[in-house]
């Protein structure tokens, strides 16, 4: 019986990084893990490319949440089992997603009762997003409606992974863990850092040894609070190629940073935010991956170029609290400005931008 683990949680909390960290740990234990990346919109998403570059067995389900693609999900799980001989499959759901416990786990248990061993339904939280639901309710320049999604994701989780603890002082970690235990005491809570590896082994060992109890949790899916939150979010995906026509290499990391700064400036000008902007770029024999987790935060590089580049093949994804028409315009303008500054010739292969509740997208 295949083991299957779904990991949800906040936009930018580190779901993909956590899955990769777990996969690397489980591989070292002699198991064969696989990762199934799920998001809305097109194929060739940043998370899929980054996961594949890590060396893990990886596939994607795109176009919609796995909550609504059960037959496709089961087909991929079987393929991992039969072709890759995977012992366990880890998959995420989009960062705005709730209801996965019901729509994924309960449905699999009903319709495929003897085929999959379901690990505890899991959510990743991070210190910055948690600040929005702490008693002081910090202002993260995100719509008020986002607090509902953050809270709902934790309420339906059987396991909470409190990630990025390497960014906290000991007293901050103690405060946040006390809050999680008080308000989400139904869940098993692990403190960890997927980036540094702290706490990864303990969490992974528990997740693969325990089974989901399949609790019934009403998180208000489809209700007015859910719809109000979804209405504030837009998705942007683009694939593009840039090349130096003069052949003189430039700093690819600086180009990515300038592009992100141009996006930040434009979002701030219209008082909008991007809970998660991410880019994966393939250059000459190496790759870079960068993220921006909001207009008030610094740019983070999970991987950077070690040498100047003359051409880059890039995928960029943005999940923004912004109208889709505004987001589409400012993302394009920011990229073209950065390309002009660095002397890149730009070729756009694919772009899509949509609001979660845009007409025709429901």
Please annotate each region the language model reported.
Residues 1-7, 12-17, 209-362:
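P-loop NTP-binding site
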Residues 3, 69-72, 100, 146-153, ...:
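Helical mechanochemical/support elements of P-loop NTPase systems and associated helical scaffolds
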Residues 35, 189-191, 348:
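A structural preference for short, hydrophobic beta-strand core positions in alpha/beta folds
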Residues 16, 27, 31, 109-113, ...:
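Non-catalytic alpha-helical coupling and interface elements of nucleotide-dependent molecular machines
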Residues 147-230:
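Canonical P-loop GTPase G-domain recognition
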Residues 2-8, 13, 17-148:
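Nucleotide-state-sensitive switch-loop elements of NTP-binding domains
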Residues 65-66, 195-200, 285, 355-358:
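A short acidic, often aromatic-flanked loop/helix-cap motif at beta-alpha or helix-coil junctions
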Residues 47-54, 174-181, 330-336:
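Short, aromatic/basic amphipathic alpha-helical patches
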